């Protein structure tokens, strides 16, 4: 299993990061004689521009040049953000539109991240693991190989307080929809967490847990194979 960042390392990373309020600005006007700052990314024609820049840099430029701007639309989706989204260029996994994966998260080969899933800084998604729609892996939460994290489930994050232990999900675990795994919990290999369960204590390998709080109700050997199958075809990438 991949070694994840410590809470102290994540805290230091966030503290030291240059905070960013990026803007996307659409403007129409007469810009033929306007010189744009070198740190602006500018696209378009002499009378219509799309600009990518920081809010702190845009303000003085706008104040100096608003007389030549006829129309303006500004898009801003964050303020003083410390952690950008992860560059997925070299990620060998299936990641669907609308997933939010932050920098310093680890996505291993063959993983599947579905629409609306959130993977926070320091989290680890193991090889062949599927994180279903709207599921959340909080900071430092770690899954092993071939895990299924059901839709809407939450693996609690632990960055603050830094002394807390992260959630660890071992290999071949099935987590049902809308389950919650609290900080410090380890779910043993091959276990099944029922939909809607709230897991407050470690789960033994091969156990099936359900309820609030979750309790062992049987063993996975008592569950039909078809109900705990991990489908490799869903993890297949282009040949």
UniProtKB/Swiss-Prot annotation:
InterPro entries registered for this protein in UniProt:
DapH (IPR019873), DapH_N (IPR013710), Hexapep (IPR001451), Hexapep_transf_CS (IPR018357), Trans_hexapeptide_repeat (IPR050179), Trimer_LpxA-like_sf (IPR011004)
Indicate the enzyme's highest-level EC class.
transferase
Q: Enumerate the Gene Ontology biological process terms.
A: diaminopimelate biosynthetic process; lysine biosynthetic process via diaminopimelate
Disulphide-bonded residues:
none
Question: Which GO molecular function entries does the Swiss-Prot or TrEMBL record give?
Answer: tetrahydrodipicolinate N-acetyltransferase activity
Stated EC number for the protein is 2.3.1.89
- Role according to the record: Catalyzes the transfer of an acetyl group from acetyl-CoA to tetrahydrodipicolinate.
What family classification does the UniProt entry report for this protein?
Belongs to the transferase hexapeptide repeat family. DapH subfamily.
Recorded protein name is: 2,3,4,5-tetrahydropyridine-2,6-dicarboxylate N-acetyltransferase
Taxonomic lineage of this organism? Answer: Bacteria, Bacillati, Bacillota, Bacilli, Bacillales
